[in-house]
Amino acid sequence: MPLAQLAEPWPNMELVQLDTENGQAAPEEGGNPPCKAKSDITWVEKDLVDSTDKGEGVVKEINITHHVKEGSEKADPSQFELLKVLGQGSFGKVFLVRKITPPDSNHLYAMKVLKKATLKVRDRVRTKIERDILADVNHPFVVKLHYAFQTEGKLYLILDFLRGGDLFTRLSKEVMFTEEDVKFYLAELALGLDHLHSLGIIYRDLKPENILLDEEGHIKLTDFGLSKEAIDHEKKAYSFCGTVEYMAPEVVNRQGHSHSADWWSYGVLMFEMLTGSLPFQGKDRKETMTLILKAKLGMPQFLSAEAQSLLRALFKRNPANRLGSGPDGAEEIKRHPFYSTIDWNKLYRREIKPPFKPAVGQPDDTFYFDTEFTSRTPKDSPGIPPSAGAHQLFRGFSFVATGLMEDSKVKPAQPPLHSVVQQLHGKNIQFSDGYVVKEAIGVGSYSVCKRCIHKTTNMEYAVKVIDKSKRDPSEEIEILLRYGQHPNIITLKDVYDDGKYVYLVTELMRGGELLDKILRQKFFSEREASSVLHTICKTVEYLHSQGVVHRDLKPSNILYVDESGNPESIRICDFGFAKQLRAENGLLMTPCYTANFVAPEVLKRQGYDEGCDIWSLGVLLYTMLAGCTPFANGPSDTPEEILTRIGGGKFSVNGGNWDTISDVAKDLVSKMLHVDPHQRLTAKQVLQHPWITQKDSLPQSQLNYQDVQLVKGAMAATYSALNSSKPSPQLKPIESSILAQRRVKKLPSTTL
């Protein structure tokens, strides 16, 4: 089930009272400021503080010492280029920054900047807590502090930049998942919490927006400003902090709490992930706290017995009886039957594949951060550098297009795109601000592809301009963002949306079309053809395993990124017809969800689309081997002739090149071009075929080809026939029907 909608990932936090270093409460300046009424923010309630906790404490000015990344020199603000504002809290901002000095130049970080002048004593304490904890923690599921330093007026924390956004918001908006999927995230979270507890740290602020995703989909715990360092597990903290719905009973009634309070919050998160709602939530914070202290929790019966058992063990109001509070700590959690399928060692080594991969593109993407912040120009920065200035090359896409940009006819603006695209450049940046458009390099029915030059770097790119009134490119963009990091899939560089057109910027594909290059080579062998198909099929198998079908794998959409002709430089392009497997509500589905809950007819349709991809690769393989296309003799063949041959599965593997081609190659071609899509080999089966696995034993004799233009014309005719609209049936008198005529013959003759 999708998760409930959650709070913003960067809420403004009002901390009314926090402990100072000696464990006492610090007095507030200027009386008691009112608490925020919202229940989804972090806060401290002063009127709940017992009189025994109100003694005046010793206030200490916090002086943050420098923390330097291993192998680096002492850092200062001048070493970081401000790129974007990611968020803003009550006493500081968070920026996306790029390191501009060695040894980690060009690396992206998140930088917290805290102004000393605006910090009250409680905030200074909170900052020191975060800095000390982060400096001590080194764990795969906890955010890492790389640098810490200060100037006369500011404090700086340089942290991991996590591009995936927060776990709950991403899952609630994008994907359908199962109890098995939830188990993965909870298991990683348990390891992160266990590590903090082993250092004597009580997290105390475990809530959805503090669990972030990296680009692979693994979790990272962040924001330790409310954590309490204890000498050992016998020590208790008394400050009232955290987010109310996730508070343990002993935190609410201020009896003092230890690390076991985190396991209560862990149970709240587990309940929320599995059900989409919070276990204890009243109409206001007072009622919510009453429910936490007294309410009996009903357990949803759709949860497994193991999940219900773990929740009951975590929701013990007496912390001494709570699972995880004993001397074995998190080992008690890990031994619970709910986690019987988890390999904890593999999980720690990040060897278990996450159920969901966030759609993130280039390293400086900030899709998953609030546009309220990301659209702002970073203060003290000359401006947001156009992202095409990144110091790396970006791959291009296929050449599909029309003269759209010359169309002066005004059309109504289309609805805004997927939120991912809306957030890319904020609100005011236009494509023409960063690029100069040059000549067209391809045309199509709904888009134009042109060469363009980045104004700052003078680097050449290609831009695909899509008319939104003719096609919604959201699916194409999301697929490229999520899977474009694969080495043989085009990488989306930039996206712009002016309301009428969408601009997809990629690198210019300098190597041209795959078939062009192969047919023009003086020498091309069966062994080389095997290497080419292996690279392409491996990429298609990756897409199919992610629930993505391309649906337009004609040879003109497979290109070389450079002139080398190496299989590694092959790119699958143009995902304009590609689809991701989705639930009825439009959300993506994890592999586990697909296997257990998707209707057979949906899977059958997905299998059909995958079969179409394999058929297209079969056509490509046939052409590489035979030097001609399987179903068209030339561009003059009619669609009816071509479709008849395709429908009958009629193609020849005799004569010409076929006389010297191996039998194992003929076997593979026949199985990829099988007329029944459900009987064709899958991409995985193609990769396991002897023609692929034993390529070193294949012949190296030269293959002969027809004229390049003749082959390309025949290929174009093939796909044109497939895409041509089917003629509507002509209505004729019933008497002309063969069935009616047959029935008339069977009628008994009668005489009056």
Curated annotation (Swiss-Prot):
A biological process term (GO) from this entry: positive regulation of DNA-templated transcription
Residues of the active site: 205 (proton acceptor), 552 (proton acceptor)
EC identifiers of the protein: 2.7.11.1
Modification after translation (UniProt): Autophosphorylated on Ser-398, as part of the activation process.
Pfam families to which the protein is assigned, alphabetical: Pkinase, Pkinase_C
Cellular component per GO, a single term: cytoplasm
Keywords noted in UniProt: ATP-binding, Kinase, Nucleotide-binding, Phosphoprotein, Repeat, Serine/threonine-protein kinase, Transferase
Residues recorded with modification Phosphoserine: 239, 381, 398, 749
Molecular function per GO: ATP binding; magnesium ion binding; protein serine kinase activity; ribosomal protein S6 kinase activity
Domain Protein kinase: 80-339, 435-692
Tissue: Small and large intestine, spleen, stomach, and bursa, and to a lesser extent lung and kidney.
InterPro entries given in the database record: AGC-kinase_C (IPR000961), Kinase-like_dom_sf (IPR011009), Pkinase_C (IPR017892), Prot_kinase_dom (IPR000719), Protein_kinase_ATP_BS (IPR017441), Ribosomal_S6_kinase_II (IPR016239), RSK_N (IPR041906), Ser/Thr_kinase_AS (IPR008271)
Domain of life: Eukaryota
Regulation of its function: Activated by multiple phosphorylations on threonine and serine residues.
Cofactor(s) named in the record: Mg(2+)
Catalytic activity: L-seryl-[protein] + ATP = O-phospho-L-seryl-[protein] + ADP + H(+); L-threonyl-[protein] + ATP = O-phospho-L-threonyl-[protein] + ADP + H(+)
Residues with the Phosphothreonine modification: 377, 590
Domain AGC-kinase C-terminal: 340-409
Kinase recorded as keyword: yes
Residues annotated to bind ATP: 86-94, 112, 441-449, 464
EC primary class: transferase
UniProt record similarity statement: Belongs to the protein kinase superfamily. AGC Ser/Thr protein kinase family. S6 kinase subfamily.
Its biological purpose: Serine/threonine kinase that may play a role in mediating the growth-factor and stress induced activation of transcription.
Name recorded for this polypeptide: Ribosomal protein S6 kinase 2 alpha
Gene (UniProt): RPS6KA
